[in-house]
Amino acid sequence: MAKDDVIEIDGNVVEALPNATFKVELDNKHIILCHIAGKMRMHYIKIMPGDRVKVELTPYSLDKGRITYRYK
């Protein structure tokens, strides 16, 4: 996947699910399923419900995403 095809959008984590999967409510009120990006897993960055995160979506599947950044 080319990096320019990615859609980046902010949201809030609503619920933590098994296997490092989260329900994220985007700023436009859509709720999507997201998993943690590999670099965040590698550096043991913890994500809790209520955290503000940056999510990457592909144009092919707008209901699943990848969490790439947790705001402080």
UniProtKB/Swiss-Prot annotation:
Coiled coil: none annotated. It is found in: Cytoplasm. Keywords: Cytoplasm, Initiation factor, Protein biosynthesis, RNA-binding, rRNA-binding. One of its GO terms (molecular function) is translation initiation factor activity. Pfam families: eIF-1a. It comes from the Bacteria. GO terms for cellular component: cytosol. Its main location: cytoplasm. Residues 1-72 form the S1-like domain. Belongs to the IF-1 family. Component of the 30S ribosomal translation pre-initiation complex which assembles on the 30S ribosome in the order IF-2 and IF-3, IF-1 and N-formylmethionyl-tRNA(fMet); mRNA recruitment can occur at any time during PIC assembly. One of the essential components for the initiation of protein synthesis. Stabilizes the binding of IF-2 and IF-3 on the 30S subunit to which N-formylmethionyl-tRNA(fMet) subsequently binds. Helps modulate mRNA selection, yielding the 30S pre-initiation complex (PIC). Upon addition of the 50S ribosomal subunit IF-1, IF-2 and IF-3 are released leaving the mature 70S translation initiation complex. This is Translation initiation factor IF-1.
